[in-house]
Structures are given as structure tokens and as C-alpha cells.
Amino acid sequence: MAPAASRLRVESELGSLPKRALAQYLLLLKLYPVLTKAVSSGILSALGNLLAQTIEKKQRKDSRLLEVSGLLRYLVYGLFVTGPLSHYLYLFMEYSVPPEVPWASVKRLLLDRLFFAPTFLLLFFFVMNLLEGKNVSVFVAKMRSGFWPALQMNWRMWTPLQFININYVPLQFRVLFANMAALFWYAYLASLGK
């Protein structure tokens, strides 16, 4: 009888692990909102790059090791750009277009899609170019060839997600929601950079 009781206790403790992790995340989010969002954004951005590299390796049947510098670039971008900037942009959007304003959901979506999306994409290309140590001519060439297709893909993929995010996801979870979706978005952007 003791082994069964012991097994049940272990199983119940394992079930509480996600609850404890969530409680810890919520506490950190409350105490250090920008830092928590920055760290989670950095980690999820690096995971998105890892996903892109893994997909690319399988498509090319490549046996090379993963490019650690790519993971680090995405980590830095998420940690210092996406996480903190997203935190403040969602706050700005929440307070500049409060939910009770007529057509708030449409106004927020238009603000996000027509202003924030192109700005973030431009910033992405610029920061990645800097982190890769490339010159301005490479940046300009990449903008000419990749910006418009990437923005069109952004509008297709992110518009429904951002409508849900900015209108239905609680403010403190919007960066995390976007970061989870961005796993696949960064995989797409990383594939453009190759």
C-alpha cells in the first residue's frame, strides 16, 4: 500500500509543478513587468530561431551544427527590443484607445497594423543587420528585397492574432501571447535572412 500512496503523492506533486511555475511567473510579472516580459521575449525569440534552423536543416538534409550566433542575435533582439518595446506599446495602446471608446477594437487594430507592424519590422531588419555586423548597403538591399513581402506576410498572419490579443487578452499577458505566436513568425523571418 505504501508504494501506491507514494506514487500518488509524486503524481500530484508533478501536477502542481505547472501551477507553481505559473504562480512564479505571475509574481515576477507583477514585481518586474518589463524585465519578465523582456526575458520571456528573449527566450521565445531564440526558440523561434532554433525552430527556423531546425526546419532549414531538415529541408536541406544538412548535418552542420546549429548556428549559435543566430540564437544569440534573436535572444538579444527579444531581450532588449521586442520585450520592453512591446510592453510599452501595449500600454500606450490601452490608454490612448481605451476599450470604452467607440470602435476601439478597430482603432487599436489599425494602429497596430498600420503603424506598429511596419515600424517593428523595420526595427527588426535594422537591429539584425547591426548584430550581424553588416554595413548599410546590405541593410538597404535587404529592405528592398525583403521588407514588403515580410510586411504582407505579417499582415496576413498577425492581423487575426493581434485582433484577439489587443481586444481580448488581458494587458499583462499580451506580450507573452504575441511571443508565443512569434515563435513561428521568427522562424519565417529567419528563413528570409538566409
Swiss-Prot record:
Protein name (Swiss-Prot/TrEMBL): Peroxisomal membrane protein 2
Parts of the chain on the Peroxisomal side: 52-74, 135-172
Record's subcellular location: Peroxisome membrane
Classification via InterPro entries: Mpv17_PMP22
Described purpose of this protein according to its UniProt entry: Seems to be involved in pore-forming activity and may contribute to the unspecific permeability of the peroxisomal membrane.
Keyword list, A-Z: Membrane, Peroxisome, Transmembrane, Transmembrane helix
Organism name: Mus musculus (Mouse)
Similarity remark: Belongs to the peroxisomal membrane protein PXMP2/4 family.
PANTHER family per record: PEROXISOMAL MEMBRANE PROTEIN 2, PEROXISOMAL MEMBRANE PROTEIN 2, PXMP2 MPV17
